[in-house]
């Protein structure tokens, strides 16, 4: 289960980074832009307005601290959901349950679950690309990295 309640320490850490220039405890698109620029990121006014709109539940045109916490929680939920789906897909392919996908397991999955089935050469190329530790198999970390890169 995903924990949507932040500890007091987490809230304090978030609050430290959540600073409004005028001290009103809300951040405008302009303040958000200035903060992001100080971190080396640059966005257009339209992009900043969209970022504000995405988490501005009271439609005030600014982000309050509580809205920022909810926005972070929502992103964490989405990430956790994706991660759990990656894990399920990996577990479905890992027939012997040893925590790595062998070439045989990957070939079985890619030749029976995908239309048209992938060739052995294409699957070998995927393994070569994803196999960071050179053991000829794909572990969970390599699998997630492969999925995210495709």
From Swiss-Prot:
One GO cellular component term: spindle
Keywords attached to this entry: Acetylation, Calcium, Cytoplasm, Cytoskeleton, Metal-binding, Nucleus, Repeat
What is a single molecular function from GO for this protein? calcium ion binding
Q: Which SMART domains match?
A: EFh (SM00054)
Tell me which residues bear N-acetylalanine: 1
Binding positions (Ca(2+) 1): 22, 24, 26, 28
**CDD domains named among the record's database cross-references:** EFh
Recorded hits in Gene3D superfamilies, A to Z, give:
EF-hand (1.10.238.10)
* Subcellular location field: Nucleus; Cytoplasm, Cytoskeleton, Spindle
- What function does this protein fulfil? May play an important role in mitosis of sea urchin egg. May function as a Ca(2+)-dependent intracellular modulator of microtubule assembly.
The record's section on PANTHER family has: CALCIUM BINDING PROTEIN
- Name-wise, this protein is 15 kDa calcium-binding protein
- Taxonomic source organism: Hemicentrotus pulcherrimus
